[in-house]
Amino acid sequence: MSGMKRRYDYEEEDGYRDFRPRYSKRQRLPPVVQLCKDMLPDIRTIGESVKAFEEDIKFLSEAIINEFGNDEYFNNALLSTFNALILEQPHKQPAIALLTIVVNSGNPAAGKSVINYFYEKLQHLLDMTVVDDFEVTSNETGPWNKIKLTLRFLSLLSPVITLTELTNVYQRLFELAVQLNRSSDANTRNPLSEAIYTNTLLNIPYLFFFNKEDETLRTNVEDLIQYAESNYEVKTVDLSLTKEYNKNLPYEPVQWVQIVLSNVKNALANDMEELKNLFPDYQNLLPTSIEQQMFNDPLTIPEFEKLLPFSGLDKGLGSVDSMWKTPRTAFQVYLPNVVGDFSTVVPITTYTGMLFDDIIVDIVESLEFNRHEVARQVVTLDLYFKPGIFTEPGLSIAQLLVQHNEMPELSTYKIEDLAIENILGLIFKLPTVTQSFAYFYTLLVEICQNSPKAIAPVFGRAFRLFYNNLDNMDHELKMRYLDWFSIQMSNFNFSWKWNEWEQDSIAFSKSFYNPKITFAKNLIRKELRLTSNRPDVEDSLTPEFKQYLDASYISKDQLASYYQSFFEGFSFDPEVIKDNDLLFKNEVFPFHEKVQLILDYIHKQPLEKNISELESLLEDIKSAHGDKIPDFNRFTVTLLIQALVYSGNRSLSHANKYISDAKSDLVTILEKMEVPPEVKEQWIIEAVIRYWNCNSQNGFLIVDSFKHSELVTAKSILTFSLTDLNGQNLGLVDATSIESTFRTLTELALQQASDISVFEFVFERLLEIINDTVSQLGTNEEIVAPSVDNETMLDVDELARLDLIWKYESAVGFIKSILRKYSDEYSVLLDKFSAGLEQAVPHEPTRKQLDQWFNEIREL
């Protein structure tokens, strides 16, 4: 706001008379509207200029002191702006609180109005916690998260609010947390209890922001902490289902509820040394005389009995509230002592680190509607805290190493690392994400575009951590990592240092199930799908990785065998098989002219079609060439399906049109075949995927269209994906197939009456794969892939055995993901699964793992 005109007087001068002729002109805004239009943007950006902060507080407070109470429009606009900042940009709360304290000294009625407004907001939010039809929008963080933020703001106002009233709110929230915690047995956590306990403790240091020397406040806070410590029993619940890594975790998971008390106590210890190094000192801006205010009415906490049904936080109350449904853990990417003998992010085991994580998550979640603002705010968070917490923005790791060696007393914490780590934590959150992946991915792209030199290396270090831990990473998270990596690369010219991974490719390129090889293959294929200019991807690869440029779902030899399997006594040159083309219309086939007539028929308008014409064409082919086509039913289905797909290959909507138009004819022809429905459906799916062999993502999406037209079932799609082909199971490793499986199950889960038998089928099919793999390995011991040095030369037998172990881990990891992701559906099947587990799974270590997951499902 520095340098702006500071006058907010829009009233015309007394006695001014204008005798000029009147001309038509744009209507002037009312003075109060113009005032708001000029002043509120300055409030929204308060603190963004450190140099202008003191001047901003002075002029804004003067304007509010003079204007508040004169017009309802101004009052409402100001309070709404305050509320938006407090909930959406909590790092600006101290600035708004300071503004309020200064205003209170010059206009106590205005100060009282602000306090009452937020106290009433607090009461309203508490009332909303027991409302069944609570309305949730995409940026709704939840009533309990908003209670946290509203109480934090009121805590900042401790100099102007009667302390007993303020600390009484804390006491009552702690009592509620304790009561909820005691409502369940010693081994069962209460999600809401943990949220209230953690959030309330996290707010306590804000009571001292402007009020560090108040002895009464210190005594009251000591009593509060003593009560929480003595009465709240922290319950340790370890859910392996929601762990990001299946084994060899790169860091020890830390739950927020386990560390918040010690973090707060340490922050208040040693005469609040940590807080003095964290919070900026605004004492010189505080007014000399302060008038204290009281709340209008006692706070009403919802009755325990009414609140208990909502305490699982599983009723869709908001994005941040829902994060407490399962134990809230700290996600770590930039681990200490990796790049040097220091850390680049503030440890979560400090109050400072925990608070920064909390604020960044709140900004990302509550400002979801304004991605550009989020991208700007999360990397400038350091401006609102004490200088020196973070190192200079954009400092490279090499520069940081030099600085640390020369001046070890300087901070090594990077605000970029902290922001990116928290956003990645939201992307990799299990069991569910809080926003669409598109929002998180594009947010990261924008942050990088705003400052590529500073952010690109931060991304690179995250890429490397995830890649190095692919062997251990959760199955579903591998897919999220793949998506994020591919989107980042496609937005930055597909640039990556592929040479870093070359040794892995040299060592394991012959493996089918090695996690790093499957990742590289899927990544390159995904990049090819994301660009219309193939050379962009090709040119970015080193020679070692160009072997993975073939994006085919199955090999050319397998595809040729598929087409040749339709004929006996007739063969063709495999070279005639072309991508995205209808093979059977090629002139090498004696019936190609009839195929062209079938295509002509498909292109006719629905009212012009007569199925007898189509049947006649098929009969002509059978009469003339049936002796060379042993299974004419299979051939007919494949020909018609591929002809449809070929006709609609310009776009998915185009394909949908042709499928819809041809549905009646297809049903008529299929019904006349004396073949089991599931066999015909496999023919349909295989025909589509083989046609789109060069782009199986398109193939699976078009298969979905056949499903929506009720020509194939969800179970048939899953059967196809999870069936071995020549001893290999693409459904475990190919990204497009895995995406199809998750998409199919998710669509089923969203239906009001989902078909549980399909979920049962997928589980049982994966068990079959596991049992078969264990049998081939011939072991009763626990199966864990050894850490294999990529410099080691493996013979054929060693690699084959390793591949079986990786296959086993892929299938077990897949089961872990579907049990977690579709826990509601699988919870119905738990008794059945448990009863038959010993017979269904001979391998005891696998059986124990599944039994553990069955028990954990009840916690999700």
From Swiss-Prot:
Q: Which SUPFAM superfamilies does this chain map to? A: ARM repeat
Provide the protein's localization.
Nucleus
Return the GO cellular component terms, semicolon-separated: commitment complex; nuclear cap binding complex; nucleus
UniProt-recorded Gene Ontology molecular function terms: mRNA binding; RNA cap binding
Which chain regions cross the lipid bilayer? none
Query: Which GO BP annotation is one of this protein's?
Result: mRNA 3'-end processing
Q: Superkingdom of this entry's organism?
A: Eukaryota
Provide the alphabetized UniProt keywords: mRNA capping, mRNA processing, mRNA splicing, mRNA transport, Nucleus, Ribosome biogenesis, RNA-binding, rRNA processing, Transport
Where in the numbering of this chain does the MIF4G domain appear? 36-271
- Gene3D superfamilies linked to this entry: 1.25.40.180
* UniProt entry tagged with the keyword rRNA processing: yes
Q: Which family does it belong to?
A: Belongs to the NCBP1 family.
The record describes its quaternary structure and partners as: Component of the nuclear cap-binding complex (CBC).
Main function: Component of the cap-binding complex (CBC) involved in the nuclear export of capped U snRNAs. The CBC complex is required for efficient pre-mRNA splicing through efficient commitment complex and spliceosome formation; and involved in rRNA processing at sites A0, A1 and A2.
**What name has this protein been given in UniProt?**
Nuclear cap-binding protein complex subunit 1
Q: Which gene specifies this protein's sequence?
A: CBC1
